[in-house]
From Swiss-Prot:
Role summary: Synthesizes alpha-1,4-glucan chains using ADP-glucose.
Pathway(s) this gene product operates in, as recorded in its UniProt entry: Glycan biosynthesis; glycogen biosynthesis
GO molecular function term, any single one: alpha-1,4-glucan glucosyltransferase (ADP-glucose donor) activity
CDD domains: GT5_Glycogen_synthase_DULL1-like
E.C. number: 2.4.1.21
Taxonomic superkingdom: Bacteria
Keywords: Glycogen biosynthesis, Glycosyltransferase, Transferase
EC class (word): transferase
Name by which UniProt lists this protein: Glycogen synthase
Binding-site residues, ADP-alpha-D-glucose: 20
Signal peptide positions (record): none
Amino acid sequence: MSRRNYKVLYVSGEVSPFVRTSALADFMASFPQALEEEGFEARIMMPKYGTINDRKFRLHDVLRLSDIEVPLREKTDMLNVKVTALPSSKIQTYFLYNEKYFKRNGLFTDVYLGNDLKGNTEKVIFFNVGVLETLVRLGWKPDIIHCHDWYASLIPLLLKTVYRDHEFFKGIKTVLTIHNAYRQGVLPFKVFEKLLPEEVSGALHRSAENVNMLYTGVENADMLTTTSKLHADEILHDEIPGCGLQQILAGQNGILHGIVNGIDTRQWNPSTDKLIKKRFATDRMDGKLDNRAALSEEVHMPFEDGRPVVGVIMHFDDFQGAVLIEKSLKKLVALDIHLLICGAGDKKYEKSFRDFADAHPDRVSLSTDCPESFLHLAIAGLDMLVMAGKIESCGMLQMFAMSYGTIPVAYAGGGIVETIDEVSEGGGSGFIFREYTPDALVSKLHEAIGLYHDSERWQELVMRAMTRDFAWKGAAEEYAGLYRELLGN
């Protein structure tokens, strides 16, 4: 088989710019394009959530992909498929739709992240089975189905059970990438038992009355990856980053590989970015100040000269750092900064951040609606970006930030230490704190602010950050090698 004939289907619960809650969406927006440059044909499947605007993203119906039967144990549901090209590419992205499951705005959640457990369990089963049935109708047979996180973790088991003898699926291999080890898809077993044949439900990884989707995927995928070498070691050996996966991963005979993320340097390039106020580069930095001013207008908060603008962009949950930021707010504001918090998620954190912003309107701003255009403007207009995730497999925001001269201040986890060169005398591209406490965060940010007020040294730091190379090419070559190894070529 020649390299150009390899076909890979990527299956994910989120893809930017259609839906974004985490770095997974950014990965999906750019990595398949990088793989195509390595001689692979890539396509994507994801759910068609109610939040996705058909007109904005030019989705259209595919007549031959309408009324596809999705066989479940006690019933047969129907799905329809819409398609568009991933922006700035020719990669076909298929959106699986059923009004009952996806018309509501909510994304996939589990026992730890949401309340509608029955509805979410039915949704995830329908989606995973629907992906395979859509492939049959489409008649496009991938060599590899690359599943991402727990949302797609049922597919490897389905291929080993009910689809095992289906001629279409013979020879297809599966890869599962763990982006978020702490989001595992813990869902009630009784719904799986009701909707899936016994040979599937009986093989699910089960604890008490719940199924663990991520565990099930880990047990059945042909190859496992995560998004940095250090995080691969962390989830194998450390209790907190591993989130209970250590034992099951240790039993998978060395099939886990860590590959550091890259970014799409065509989409994330301040000299060509159409989503920012004014483009800039290392030899014409005035545009960064224009973006700072535009960001000030966007969040309705005047930015004072000499006061750094610090951003926090995250999903509001404990693992992404919401609790650490909440505990640090008073000390952060005492540093004499403008603080922008952008994200959504747990309503208790959203309320806490909103109350604090309302109490400090000249110093703190909260944005819970963060479309792609705002994300680009924020990255371009900020002076510093705080990344407080307790568990960070790799992350991509820090790479976006450095490319735009926005200096990261991040907790030392996973790919953070593989992508940020820690500031030292005459070198480095960002700041890293190593104790997960408010004092450690505030102390490191205070150090960064001290350098900010030394304009000559700060500009040298900004130049070093902006000239880092975060392109996907190296990671794409590693993945291409793993794919070929998996296919025995």
